[in-house]
């Protein structure tokens, strides 16, 4: 089981609602579950009804100030946006709020890193994390410094993600080559299964829909069953008679 000896982070969720409907509150309910799976606690949430998203700060100026006050009042250690933030939005919000700023993508990648168990899964997750991070390095020195630890910063096996742009490029190149070899090996195994003429059935569904539970019931596979989003990540094959 994943262990985190760091102090539990406390965050505030925020989003812009362009339609003034029910979807954004539902999205934040799911985001709160994601945050919990990543190992943090949600203290509150903020939604701004707006016709458009601010290119520089995502939220309007007044709401940014309200969010900063909320962070100070509740003692939050960070904020999480339901949408994917651009590099400039993340940088500006970090400066305005004076706290750690994350988005949904960072949380999901963090969970993937937490639950990846196979070599290929770990390679895929770290590669995705580094590509996401490399696109956000320009002009984000302060942000990356603040993201020095905790959720949103951990690679597979609790390894701290690289922040140096040159080293990231080198690591991406190596991961891509290693992953290419793993994919080639998996393709060989797939062809062998196809040539065996044994029917192949896949269990598919949204996260936390019960796929692992069904697999265990059918095959006694013994894979992890947990009432969390993305509790299991890597594909699993079992024989069923």
PLM region descriptions:
Residues 127, 131-144:
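A charged, well-structured terminal subsegment
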Residues 1-110:
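N-terminal accessory targeting/assembly segments
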Residues 121, 125-128, 132, 166, ...:
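Residues on a specific face of well-ordered alpha-helices
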Residues 3-9, 140, 145-241:
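Conserved G1/Walker A P-loop phosphate-binding module
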Residues 18-22, 53-57, 115-120, 159-160, ...:
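Flexible beta-alpha connector loops of hexameric P-loop NTPases
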